[in-house]
Structures are given as structure tokens and as C-alpha cells.
């Protein structure tokens, strides 16, 4: 009976936490009967039920995520690209063109580059405008080297006057990311559905050598001294990744050759130096149809960059684009020490000579000055010198008059004493 009381609460908890499982019926034993079921078995059954419930919850959660992703915008875009690929493939097949699906991938890549050409043009215009303003930016950096706050304000004012938005080049790149993801999903779905089974020139199959998530199982480990797909197929599949890495390096070299003087561009080039190797490694883990798309897209992007940099004109006034010089209308602020002219002893001597013997001022002599700032300072120094001379002459006259009055007073007193004595 004690065992029955111990089982009832445990089964009650199980019913509360796991409603999907039916409750175990309680078996009433007769008087004198003893339950032989150990407690460990009861705990094991509870753990099995909990594990089963966790697995059910995990499957349900994964199903919900799959349902949400299936109707998302990226999935809709991927389905649209799949439809375009299928339409192009059928059209090329009806025209009796061999390797129809490979040429359909190339045609889709060209259509996408044409559709995103305005965004690419906007990006190149923004990049060229920023490059044209680099001399002024460097001038501001040298001028406000110890004042980052004013440097930021003056740089923002410069961009505003030139009508340039530094972030404008990022928006076209961000806008093309969903397109790339949609194309990637479309080609991945085509490979999973077996639509990329045909080859393309030397490539045995556009769906090979691996599937999504298959990794490098087609290349390693070796079996009987050869890759799993054989040496001939492995060499054929490796040609496209090698071409992709080479084209990526050539594209970086061509595009970055015009920006070697920009330190920020040099730093970015050093960081992106290993990007082609990463892309090449990734191309070994996906179907060859995706590698073909990346290769063609890379060639078209390089051609677009060269064409736009040769044809796009930057509309920035020369007064804003060129650095400030001595002959320009932009004033150059000089240090205070250069603006104030020091008065020399020779100039003070010439000012003293401009007075006659009676201390009266004579006609002023014209003094040559170097700059307007120095003339104003020397004029003020001359005025203060003349005021000092007048003050000293006045004091000398007062002292002479006082001495004369003292002497005359003493002489008058001595004569009065003589008269009294007489």
C-alpha cells in the first residue's frame, strides 16, 4: 500500500507535465501482496517520457522555423529566380543550344547585373567623389590634428558643401545582398531537385561534385590512392574554383590600382587580401553551378567598375576640391606671432627724431610696413610712444617751475630778515 501511495504522486506530476502521454493505470493489489517494482525502474520511465516530450517539442519548433522561412521574402525571391532559370533553360533547349542550363545560369547573371546597374553606378559616383575630396580632407586633418571635434565638424561641412554623402556607397552594396542570397538559394534548390545534372564543357555535372552540406567528401579521404570521384573528375571539378580565385585576385588588382594613394584604401586592401582564398574554399563545398555564377558575376562586376570609372564625371567645384593656397580666395589663418610686428630700437629712434627741441610734434614720416596687421600694431606702438614723451615733458616743466618757485621764495625771505635787523 505504501508503494501505491508513492506511485500516485509521481504519476500525477507526470500527467501535469506531459499531457501527451496517457496516464498509467493504478493497479490495486490484494491484501498481503507486495509490489516487486523497484524505484529505479519508475525513475527510468519518467526520464524516457521526458526525453520523448523534448524530442517532440524540438521537432515542432524546427517545423515552425521551416514554415516561417518558407514564406519569407528571400524564399519568394529564390522561387522567382528558379522560375527564370527554368524558363531560360527551356528556351535555350528549344533553340538547340548545348549546355542549356549552364548558359541559363550565365544569362540570369547578366540580367541581374543589368537590373542592379543603377545601384552600381551610384556606388561608383560616391566613391569617386570621396576620392576627389581627399586633398581637402588631408588638409583639414593636418590643420585640426589636435582637435578631433572640430575636424569632424569641418569634414562634415566639406561633404555638405560638395553635396557628397559618405554612406551613399554602402546602400547599393546592401541592396544587392538579398539578390545574391536569392540566387544562391535558387541554385541550391535546383541542385537538390536534380535539375543541375547536365554538364558544362569540361565540368561533368553542374550539380557536382558535392551537394549542399556535403563538404569535401568528393575529394578526401582518398580511396585506393585516388579521390572518391576519381582523378579525372576531381581535376575537372577543380578548374572552376581555380579560375574563380584567379579572377578575384585580378579584379582586386585592377580596381585597387587607382586607389594606392589612399591610406584607408590600402588598409582595406590588406584586410581583403585573403578574401579570394576564402571564396575559393567555399566554392569547393558547393555545386559547380554556383561556382559558375560567382565566376561570371566577378567578370561582369570588374567590367562595370572599369567602364563607370572611365565615364562617370564628378561634379565638384574646383574651389571646394582643391587645397587652399596663397593665391586662392580661401583665407589662410597664420599664427599670432606672424601677425604682430615687433617694434625695433631703430624705429623708436626715428620716432624720437620726429620731435623738435620744444617737444612739439612735427610732420610724421611715412614708415614702410609689411602687412596690414603689422601696420596697425606699429601705429599703436608709435601713439603710445608719443604719449609717453608728452607726459615726461610735462613732468619736467612742473619740476622746473616748482624749483624756481622754491628758489624765489628763499631769496625773498633772506631780504626780509636783513630789513628787520636794520
UniProtKB/Swiss-Prot annotation:
Task: For this UniProt record, give its keywords in alphabetical order, as a comma-separated list.
Answer: Chloroplast, Membrane, Plastid, Thylakoid, Transit peptide, Transmembrane, Transmembrane helix
| UniProt topology in membrane | Multi-pass membrane protein
Q: Name one GO cellular component term.
A: chloroplast thylakoid membrane
- Signal sequence annotation: none
Which InterPro entries does the UniProt record give?
Answer: YidC/ALB3/OXA1/COX18, YidC/Oxa/ALB_C, YidC_ALB_C
Report the locations given in the UniProt record. Answer: Plastid, Chloroplast thylakoid membrane
Provide the family line: Belongs to the OXA1/ALB3/YidC (TC 2.A.9.2) family.
Q: Quote the protein name from its UniProt record.
A: Inner membrane ALBINO3-like protein 2, chloroplastic
Amino acid at each position: 500500500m505504501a508503494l501505491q501511495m508513492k506511485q500516485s504522486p509521481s504519476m500525477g506530476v507526470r500527467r501535469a507535465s506531459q499531457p501527451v502521454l496517457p496516464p498509467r493505470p493504478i493497479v490495486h493489489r490484494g491484501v498481503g501482496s507486495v509490489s516487486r517494482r523497484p524505484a529505479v525502474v519508475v525513475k527510468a520511465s519518467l526520464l524516457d517520457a521526458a526525453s520523448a516530450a523534448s524530442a517532440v517539442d524540438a521537432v515542432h519548433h524546427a517545423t515552425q522555423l521551416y514554415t516561417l522561412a518558407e514564406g519569407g521574402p528571400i524564399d519568394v525571391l529564390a522561387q522567382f529566380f528558379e522560375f527564370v532559370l527554368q524558363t531560360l533553360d527551356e528556351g535555350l533547349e528549344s533553340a538547340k543550344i548545348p549546355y542549356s542550363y549552364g548558359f541559363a545560369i550565365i544569362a540570369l547573371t547578366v540580367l541581374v547585373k543589368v537590373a542592379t546597374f543603377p545601384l552600381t553606378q551610384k556606388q561608383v559616383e560616391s566613391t569617386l567623389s570621396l576620392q576627389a575630396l581627399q586633398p581637402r580632407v588631408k588638409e583639414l586633418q593636418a590643420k585640426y590634428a589636435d582637435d578631433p571635434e572640430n575636424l569632424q565638424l569641418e569634414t562634415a561641412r566639406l561633404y555638405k558643401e560638395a553635396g557628397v554623402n559618405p554612406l551613399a556607397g554602402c546602400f547599393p552594396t546592401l541592396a544587392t545582398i538579398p539578390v545574391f542570397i536569392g540566387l544562391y538559394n535558387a541554385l541550391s534548390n535546383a541542385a537538390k531537385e536534380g535539375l543541375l545534372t547536365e554538364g558544362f564543357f569540361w565540368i561533368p555535372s553542374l550539380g557536382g561534385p558535392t551537394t549542399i552540406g556535403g563538404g569535401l567528401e568528393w575529394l578526401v579521404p582518398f580511396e585506393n590512392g585516388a579521390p572518391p570521384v576519381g582523378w579525372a573528375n576531381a581535376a575537372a571539378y577543380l578548374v572552376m574554383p581555380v579560375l574563380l580565385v584567379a579572377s578575384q585576385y585580378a579584379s582586386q588588382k585592377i580596381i585597387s590600382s587607382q586607389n594606392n594613394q589612399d591610406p584607408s584604401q590600402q588598409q582595406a586592401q590588406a584586410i581583403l587580401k585573403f578574401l579570394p582564398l576564402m571564396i575559393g574554399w567555399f566554392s569547393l563545398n558547393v555545386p559547380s553551378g554556383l561556382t559558375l555564377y560567382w565566376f561570371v558575376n566577378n567578370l561582369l562586376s570588374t567590367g562595370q567598375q572599369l567602364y563607370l570609372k572611365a565615364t562617370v564625371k564628378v561634379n565638384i567645384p574646383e574651389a571646394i576640391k582643391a587645397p587652399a593656397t596663397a593665391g586662392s580666395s580661401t583665407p589662410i589663418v597664420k599664427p599670432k606671432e606672424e601677425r604682430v610686428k615687433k617694434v625695433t630700437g631703430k624705429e623708436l629712434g626715428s620716432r624720437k627724431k620726429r620731435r623738435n627741441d620744444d617737444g612739439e610734434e612735427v610732420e610724421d614720416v611715412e614708415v614702410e610696413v609689411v602687412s596690414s596687421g603689422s601696420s596697425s600694431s606699429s601705429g599703436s606702438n608709435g601713439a603710445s610712444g608719443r604719449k609717453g614723451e608728452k607726459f615726461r615733458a610735462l613732468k619736467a616743466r612742473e619740476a622746473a617751475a616748482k624749483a624756481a618757485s622754491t628758489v624765489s621764495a628763499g631769496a625773498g625771505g633772506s631780504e626780509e630778515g636783513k630789513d628787520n635787523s636794520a
